[in-house]
Amino acid sequence: MSLPRGGVALLGCTAGIALANNYAVQPALGDIARDTGTSTAAIGLVTTAALAGCIAGFAFLLPLVDRAAPRRLVTGQLLLLTAGLLLAASARGLGPLLVAYVVVGAGASVSAMASAIAGRGVPGERRGAAVGLVAAGMSAGILLSRLIGGALADAVGWRGMLLVSAGLVLACAGGAWWRLPDERPAPRGGYLATLAELPGLLRRYRALRRAVVQGSLWYFAFSLVWVALTVRLAQPPYGLDAAAIGLYSLAGALGFAALPVAGRLGDRYSPRAVICVSMAVAAVGAGVLCAGLGRPVLTGVGLALLDAGCFTAQAANQARILGVDPRRGGSLSGVYLLLYFCAGAVGSAVAAPLVSRGGWGAASLVVLGALVLAGGLALGWRDASASAVPGGRSAGAARWGFARSSPRP
């Protein structure tokens, strides 16, 4: 299977727009609670429902990448996402809204499909750049969704915001049907057999286990720092409202600008080298944040560095996973992202209690510790290919993963 010209860019836009729907509703949760007669405490379950749907999508839908044609698979899942958004826009109570957001979350998992399809649909020596471009779209969707969602909800109401989102997703579905290939991969066994082998992939592939551990550490840190930031800035002496806090996401959004470059570096050097450097950058950002939140410019610099490091490491990690066995790219990505997002959920869950008990200092130190541990593991866990010394580079460069990658067939 080969992607047409512009196919990777289309997948990147699709991934960003789809994944944004898991987060865009969050600034409007107060309005939704009032309109549906739901308590403030209960309305937070909408976010949980979206996450549950997304995790289910990773587990049960993402392995279909190894079995179905990209055109039909991506289009079908985008139509599922559109249906979930329309159902949410028409919901009159909490129950229908939660059902709708489970569907929305499952549909939004198409973002991970886009990454796997992009990695499979280009030559091996361009895999990192392709995955990096899709990761940039996903990161932009996550970081800008709350800002844009809040602005749309203010302008046209939360139901109108969901209808606009549904229209954008439907446009992506049309683009996917028009541009993505209709070539079906050769399946290996039945669908249920594919699901049954998912736990065994962790036992079989050491590279997958390492990717899961490292990725879980930095996504735990990423999720923790953003929730902790929101909680702390809403408290005295800052007392910022949701709109003002949302502006900090613009600083974090600077980080995804590094992703396309990082993807190309991942094709030139080993993923391990990119991850080591990325974690060093993220740890510097976390160290800046440890200084406190009293200076907004310094906080913005810390967030930008932390996000750039985490996003770049994620692109390299996903490219490494897809390179383990491209024929099982969907299944491998499904296992990885399932555990990756579970780690993020843990980070989000512990953020508020950590801030309330230990303050911002405790939260930022935990973030720094997780990033340093992820970087230390990347240094200690040598890639299997590191012993090769392609292109005449020194053995020392190969040992640390900075030897140029050999072109893949």
Regions found by a protein language model. Name each.
Residues 101-138:
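Cytoplasmic helix-loop-helix junction between adjacent transmembrane helices
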Residues 71-74, 97, 275:
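Primarily marks hydrophobic transmembrane alpha-helices of the MFS/SLC 12-helix fold
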Residues 133-178:
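Helix-loop-helix hairpin linking two adjacent transmembrane segments in secondary transporters
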Residues 56-92:
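Conserved MFS/SLC helix-loop-helix module at the cytosolic interface between two early adjacent transmembrane helices
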Residues 57-69, 258-271, 355:
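Helix-to-loop junctions at the C-terminal end of transmembrane segments
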Residues 272-315:
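C-terminal transmembrane helical hairpin of 12-TM major facilitator-type secondary transporters
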Residues 37, 69, 90-95, 292-293:
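Helix-breaking motifs and short loop linkers at transmembrane-helix boundaries and internal kinks
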Residues 181-213, 403:
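Juxtamembrane intracellular "pre-TM" segments in multi-pass secondary transporters
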